[in-house]
Amino acid sequence: MLSEFENGAPVQQFVSRFRSYSSKFLFFPCLIMSLVFMQWLISIGPYSGYNTPPMYGDFEAQRHWMELTLHTPVSQWYFRDLQWWGLDYPPLTAYVSWFFGIIGHYFFNPEWFADVTSRGFESLELKLFMRSTVIASHLLILVPPLMFYSKWWSRRIPNFVDRNASLIMVLFQPALLLIDHGHFQYNCVMLGLVMYAIANLLKNQYVAATFFFCLALTFKQMALYFAPPIFFYLLGTCVKPKIRFSRFILLSVTVVFTFSLILFPWIYMDYKTLLPQILHRVFPFARGLWEDKVANFWCTLNTVFKIREVFTLHQLQVISLIFTLISILPSCVILFLYPRKRLLALGFASASWGFFLFSFQVHEKSVLLPLLPTSILLCHGNITTKPWIALANNLAVFSLWPLLKKDGLGLQYFTLVLMWNWIGDMVVFSKNVLFRFIQLSFYVGMIVILGIDLFIPPPSRYPDLWVILNVTLSFAGFFTIYLWTLGRLLHISSKLSTDLRNKKEA
């Protein structure tokens, strides 16, 4: 298998310094220290809502949830002060917020999370504490399963240098680092739990995989992007090569147990009143088809056809559901028919891209979900996939530019994007002439739009024109990536089908 880094990229040169037997044990400590150093460099910059009253931003939302869970009875977590960053994530997020709030309140400074009076509180010490919680979460929850995934696929990339060069590029993907450690969120927790589920699928530990994925769902509802592919994969393992009804029952019990465990306080107190409120807060359909400008089908279509003026909210929900089901159906069917480990990442990627492009209530930051399974394809050691994986990462961080620019993270954006592409020699193109033209066109488009956005003010009549150009190009790119993941999934599954048919005939 050819390496993605056959031309000696800087990341490969870095890893090669640890290839000797006496130095290999130093590689992972140095890698972790480098990752933490990069996270802190990004964290020095501003965050979402910095010094922008009255509502501030995501930083204040996360801080407020620590305050809320610390001073409010559990039964009121999803009822209190809904106008001031009311809790709108599932209970595991609330538990984590409570845990960090306890640490900050009792071990550092109670003023940070004082009831009501701490709203909008900003200080260097609080920023340091909050940033530290994200970095710790990233290292403890996301990094270990990514390392395991890379190691599991190492049999296809036996070379120490090439294998770990791929791991570095996955760990340093710009979009996630900029959103979690710049803008400020805890996406690394949800993505880490999803990766733990995938890691356990690789080990055939289906109950553990189900448990971790349920935890991901109870941390952030956006993990639903992965629910159909993991369901059909697990269902496939229950019926192929023979029907295992006991496994299906065991997995079903695991789902019920995990959700019951997480929701137990609300079930115990008053499930008839409290559970509907949690669902209402977690799935706010009344907010509309999308928020802000997001590079999905509906927001892009709205620039030329005002769909929200033609269809009712309920009609849009039904239409988006139909489009989403159509987009994810092929990958789900393939994972059911061929529950093979080599199809996992591609199946997850294809289905989650379909969700991002066509589902209801999409945020621009949701691109991090399909980007994860797309990025870990680097660990599979196939040189032909690198141009598409690199394009997906560059398009993803490009689509986040309006948000990061608003946050004042321009320096971090350009530094990290340029560094990531340079150390991994990521701006490469497919040998296929058509694919090469498509990839080159998207890179040129991104450079042109960024240049216009930086140096030319938009027309006063169309203040969002540059953002709309960004959204349109990003959607076209994401749809292309979706088609690529689906096409590759179909190609590999057809080869599996042929191999199985030949074995039966033999």
From Swiss-Prot:
UniProt KW Aminoacyl-tRNA synthetase keyword: no
Keywords: Endoplasmic reticulum, Glycosyltransferase, Membrane, Transferase, Transmembrane, Transmembrane helix
Topological domain spans for side Lumenal: 46-132, 185-210, 269-317, 364-382, 430-436, 486-506
Pathway annotation from the record: Protein modification; protein glycosylation
Record topological domains on the Cytoplasmic side: 1-24, 154-163, 232-247, 339-342, 404-408, 458-464
InterPro entries: Glyco_trans_ALG6/ALG8
Cellular component terms per the entry's GO annotation: endoplasmic reticulum membrane; fungal-type vacuole membrane; Golgi apparatus; lumenal side of endoplasmic reticulum membrane
UniProt-annotated location(s): Endoplasmic reticulum membrane
Membrane disposition: Multi-pass membrane protein
EC number(s) reported in the record: 2.4.1.267
Catalytic activity: an alpha-D-Man-(1->2)-alpha-D-Man-(1->2)-alpha-D-Man-(1->3)-[alpha-D-Man-(1->2)-alpha-D-Man-(1->3)-[alpha-D-Man-(1->2)-alpha-D-Man-(1->6)]-alpha-D-Man-(1->6)]-beta-D-Man-(1->4)-beta-D-GlcNAc-(1->4)-alpha-D-GlcNAc-diphospho-di-trans,poly-cis-dolichol + a di-trans,poly-cis-dolichyl beta-D-glucosyl phosphate = an alpha-D-Glc-(1->3)-alpha-D-Man-(1->2)-alpha-D-Man-(1->2)-alpha-D-Man-(1->3)-[alpha-D-Man-(1->2)-alpha-D-Man-(1->3)-[alpha-D-Man-(1->2)-alpha-D-Man-(1->6)]-alpha-D-Man-(1->6)]-beta-D-Man-(1->4)-beta-D-GlcNAc-(1->4)-alpha-D-GlcNAc-diphospho-di-trans,poly-cis-dolichol + a di-trans,poly-cis-dolichyl phosphate + H(+)
Single Gene Ontology BP annotation: protein N-linked glycosylation via asparagine
Transmembrane domains' residue ranges: 25-45, 133-153, 164-184, 211-231, 248-268, 318-338, 343-363, 383-403, 409-429, 437-457, 465-485
GO molecular-function terms, A-Z: dolichyl pyrophosphate Man9GlcNAc2 alpha-1,3-glucosyltransferase activity
Functional note: Probable dolichyl pyrophosphate Man9GlcNAc2 alpha-1,3-glucosyltransferase that operates in the biosynthetic pathway of dolichol-linked oligosaccharides, the glycan precursors employed in protein asparagine (N)-glycosylation. The assembly of dolichol-linked oligosaccharides begins on the cytosolic side of the endoplasmic reticulum membrane and finishes in its lumen. The sequential addition of sugars to dolichol pyrophosphate produces dolichol-linked oligosaccharides containing fourteen sugars, including two GlcNAcs, nine mannoses and three glucoses.
PANTHER family in the record: DOLICHYL GLYCOSYLTRANSFERASE, DOLICHYL PYROPHOSPHATE MAN9GLCNAC2 ALPHA-1,3-GLUCOSYLTRANSFERASE
Family: Belongs to the ALG6/ALG8 glucosyltransferase family.
Protein name: Probable dolichyl pyrophosphate Man9GlcNAc2 alpha-1,3-glucosyltransferase
Organism whose genome encodes this protein: Schizosaccharomyces pombe (strain 972 / ATCC 24843) (Fission yeast)
